[in-house]
A protein has these predicted regions:
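Terminal targeting signals and extreme-terminal segments of soluble enzymes
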Residues: 1-105
Length: 106
């Protein structure tokens, strides 16, 4: 199965302009070009876009194992801001694969 094509059905991420560049078991890369609709009132990227970008990368890495997977917990720390015309990239890397739970760093 081509997981990049599969995740084109993620309408929320696609409507946000997020593109899945690569997906294989335990690893995925997603990108977004920041446009005006992604900015909050302060002129920086809305945190929801950043979370959605990371979530798509993690979902692709987890689901590329061939079983339908869902996240049970996520948290994010914003280390810097994104701005208009930036290209933002999220890379999900599996750090632990267990029978029922996987852990990813993004």
């Amino acid at each position: 199965m081509d997981y990049v094509d599969f995740f084109k059905k993620d309408h929320f991420a696609m409507d946000a302009g997020i593109e899945l560049k690569e997906a294989k078991p335990g690893y995925a890369v997603a990108c977004v070009n920041v446009i005006e609709k992604h900015l909050n009132a302060g002129g920086v990227v809305q945190g929801g876009l950043l979370f959605t970008l990371a979530d798509l990368a993690i979902a692709a890495a987890a689901n590329a194992h061939g079983l339908l997977a869902f996240s049970i917990q996520s948290d994010i720390r914003f280390l810097s801001s994104g701005y208009l015309n930036d290209i933002l990239t999220a890379t999900a890397t599996e750090i632990l694969l267990h029978k029922t739970v996987c852990h990813y760093i993004d």
